[in-house]
Regions:
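Sec-dependent signal peptide recognition
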Residues: 2-9
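C-terminal motif of bacterial Sec signal peptides marking the signal peptidase cleavage site
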Residues: 15-18
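Bacterial signal peptide processing site
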Residues: 20-23
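Inhibitory N-terminal propeptides of secreted protease zymogens
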Residues: 26-168, 172
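Protease zymogen maturation seam
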Residues: 102-117, 134-235, 243-249, 253, ...
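Subtilisin-like serine protease catalytic core
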Residues: 212, 218, 222-348
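Catalytic-core regions of hydrolytic enzymes
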Residues: 339, 343-363
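Residue-level detector of conserved catalytic or cofactor/ligand-binding positions
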Residues: 362-371
Length: 371
């Protein structure tokens, strides 16, 4: 547990201090004596800014959070801070990482309870807001919040093999001695590649010749499966587009928060996230995981399938750690932490929330985005 939380702290720190090389610069306050301002205002989200308070401000903030229960928090209880919050038209001041009594002690020990995001009038000059906030004595850091976009182009669709090429694939791999009986396992050259899957004469649906397979260029699943086919005690959080949680080849290996009702507006388990049965949609801040927006690419579901599509169930594909249904062995569990939705990306603070959510649930993390 201690090791996992140290990794979490490092991951969140990286999230809060990186977006691109351009954003690594720091804007210095005019006086040179204020809190550091991280990133640059160009391209940052308007009407949003992140602030980390100093530890001595915690009691004021805690009292403000308590007073705001049932409504939006708009003031901090710190006089100098509240003057600025009123001037910029603040309509919400929220703790980035919501209170969860099960993990709150660790959250405070890491200082993550001191991070807040301010939502204010979008017409207000963002750079000036940052400079003003940096002069508040109880502020330790100010950071512009940029949008994180996908590292893959949603307008580029994968080309598929022609029926003739697929027939060739199935015909030439049928004799391979493999365990899974999944319908399309023979097409998964990444799992087992004997060099016969694609030939020089094979073409895709656009008539282009495909690159022929190379023997042995795979992840050696055969040898790995002799040792382990999956372990349901392991949770993998997929930070990507939403995962199709009801897909017939995935639903058996989805992580399930039994205390919650999917997409409910009630936070039944008190972790700060309502309706998070299969994970959470951090882009839209709700428990409803979406995967069918016209601008979605299906990448989140694709990744989840590679990791843990139910193996040996007579349909679909074989997940690398999807277990073995025929032997009643479960696969690793997939948690959907949605950080992309249609054409939308998430803010830095939203991704930080996703990372912490995954860590609080003892998950391994897979992230698909720019490095």
């Amino acid at each position: 547990m201690k090791r996992i939380y140290l990794i979490l702290i490092a991951a969140v720190a990286i999230t809060f201090t990186s977006c691109s090389d351009r954003d690594m610069d720091t804007v210095k306050p005019d006086t040179g004596q204020g809190a550091p301002i991280i990133n640059l205002p160009e391209g940052a989200s308007q009407g949003k800014i992140m602030v980390k308070f100093k530890p001595e401000a915690a009691s004021f903030l805690d009292a403000a959070v308590t007073r705001s229960i049932g409504g939006a928090m708009t003031r901090s209880g710190i006089s100098d801070m509240d003057i600025i919050l009123q001037r910029i038209g603040t309509h919400k001041l929220e703790r980035i990482f919501p209170i969860d009594n099960r993990t709150e002690e660790r959250t405070r020990k890491a200082g993550l309870n001191l991070w807040y995001v301010i939502h204010f009038d979008e017409d207000t000059n963002l750079e000036q807001v940052a400079k003003d906030l940096s002069q508040v004595a109880d502020v330790a850091k100010v950071q512009f919040s940029h949008i994180i976009q996908r590292s893959y182009d949603p307008n580029v669709r994968a080309t598929v093999l022609t029926k003739q090429a697929m027939s060739h694939v199935m015909r030439n791999t049928r004799a391979i001695n493999v365990t899974p009986d999944d319908t399309y396992f023979n097409l998964q050259w990444g799992c087992k590649n004997d060099g016969s899957i694609l030939q020089n004469e094979d073409k895709n649906d656009k008539g282009d010749k495909v690159v022929p397979a190379v023997t042995g260029v795979d992840v050696n699943c055969g040898e790995a499966w002799k040792l382990c086919t999956g372990d349901p005690s392991i949770i993998v959080a997929v930070l990507d587009e939403g995962v199709m949680y009801d897909h017939p080849d995935l639903k058996g290996n989805m992580w399930v928060n039994e205390a919650e009702t999917f997409a409910s507006k009630e936070d039944a388990d008190g972790n700060g996230y309502a309706g998070d049965r299969y994970g959470y949609n951090f882009t839209d801040d709700k428990g409803y995981i979406s995967y069918d927006d016209p601008n979605d690419t299906g990448h989140g579901t694709h990744v989840a399938g590679i990791i843990s599509a139910v193996r040996n169930n007579g349909e679909g594909i074989s997940g690398i750690a999807g277990g073995d249904k025929a032997s009643n062995i479960g696969g690793v569990k997939i948690m959907s932490c949605q950080v992309f939705s249609g054409s939308k990306g998430c803010n830095l603070y939203q991704e930080a929330k996703a990372v912490k959510y995954a860590a609080d649930n003892l998950s391994l993390i897979h992230i698909s985005e720019p490095t």
